[in-house]
Amino acid sequence: MMRIRTDLDFFFVTKRPERFHISLPEDWGEGYKNVHICCTSENQYMADKRLPVFLELPIRHKSIIHGPMLGPINIERYLEKYGKEIDQVVCGGESGDEARLCDYAWVMDTMCQCVKYEVPFHFKQTGANFKRGDQIYHIPRKDRQIQAAKAKIFAEAKPA
């Protein structure tokens, strides 16, 4: 289907990059132009476990998602080595009744890492519980993406 429908973009999110090679089509090569694959890493442990595997895979369009972002995550070593191969990094807080905290400082730190290596960055949503400075905000579901957009925390790639 993905090979046939080149008029569509396919977007997949995984937390199991080690299973990527299972069921790949024979003509995958370096990936199809219309397939985007994202790997999640919610904390430093998972980033260090998943990203070395994910970033070595033959995928044309790769993105990293810190979602839900549950702590500070340093991905500089991955951005330094693979930055030109990463389409973007996305961060967002956790949703749900028992959502864990997302801290503005963690989001800003990740954005700064991306800026340093010229990798696009997008802050998708605050999550249900968002900390900025000493204040913790409990944000209704309908406002989580709106509040993230109002924060204007993003970085675009420099033109080639």
Question: What are these model-predicted stretches?
Answer:
Residues 128-160:
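C-terminal accessory extensions appended to soluble enzyme cores
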Residues 1-122:
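Conserved AdoMet/S-adenosylmethionine-binding subsite of the radical SAM
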